[in-house]
Amino acid sequence: MSVTALGMMLIAYLCGSVSSAILFCKITGLPDPRLHGSGNPGATNVLRIGGKAAAATVLVFDILKGMLPVWGAYALGVTPLYLGLTAIAACLGHIYPVFFHFRGGKGVATALGAIAPIGLDLTGLMTGTWLLTVLLSGYSSLGAIVSALIAPFYVWWFKPQFTFPVAMLSCLILMRHHDNIQRLWRGQESKIWDKLRKKKQPEDEDTSPEE
């Protein structure tokens, strides 16, 4: 492993460790997402406690903190395997942030951003898969799970040299969604539309962790 690759992985982890949800909520006076809603510091929980605009802002920053380090590594000539490990490092930072006591989100938006430098066509397919699944089912978590399952096959078709690291990244995302998978199986998972309705009601949100 080159010093450049190692350095970019460290930078990616530190970028991922900057929790957009926690910082945005603190700056704008919204409740701490770790203590309200599902307790998950991610865009979907911010949707619940802060509304669409707040969630969209957090989503954009979560995507960028995965995208920028990987693009930087790509520009520096890092090989495909270590590009993939850089992407994983960014997601690990989001999931286990060193700046926030290693309590982070589930890494879906950051993973999407990290995959973006591989190709915009692939990014479009991943986004379309998530959107289609959510529109058909109403479950944000199911969209993430389906996208993670199918991502290695998309990558194998477009850029096969990245298949192995993306498969590892998909496994990480699926592991973070094991509670959601169990609730989906039991029919206990809440739909994304419910979060919008609960935002209009007093703070009696359910505590089931989503995206």
Swiss-Prot record:
SMART domains: G3P_acyltransf (SM01207). It catalyses: an acyl phosphate + sn-glycerol 3-phosphate = a 1-acyl-sn-glycero-3-phosphate + phosphate. Disulfide bonds: none annotated. The keyword Transmembrane helix applies. It comes from the Bacteria. It is a multi-pass membrane protein. The chain crosses the membrane at residues 5-25, 58-78, 80-100, 112-132, 138-158. Its EC number is 2.3.1.275. GO terms for biological process: phospholipid biosynthetic process. It is an enzyme of class 2 (transferase). GO terms for cellular component: plasma membrane. Its main location: membrane. InterPro entries: G3P_acylTferase_PlsY. It is found in: Cell inner membrane. Pathway: Lipid metabolism; phospholipid metabolism. GO terms for molecular function: acyl-phosphate glycerol-3-phosphate acyltransferase activity. Catalyzes the transfer of an acyl group from acyl-phosphate (acyl-PO(4)) to glycerol-3-phosphate (G3P) to form lysophosphatidic acid (LPA). This enzyme utilizes acyl-phosphate as fatty acyl donor, but not acyl-CoA or acyl-ACP. Belongs to the PlsY family. PANTHER family: GLYCEROL-3-PHOSPHATE ACYLTRANSFERASE-RELATED (PTHR30309:SF0), INNER MEMBRANE PROTEIN YGIH (PTHR30309). Probably interacts with PlsX. This is Glycerol-3-phosphate acyltransferase. It comes from Pectobacterium atrosepticum (strain SCRI 1043 / ATCC BAA-672).
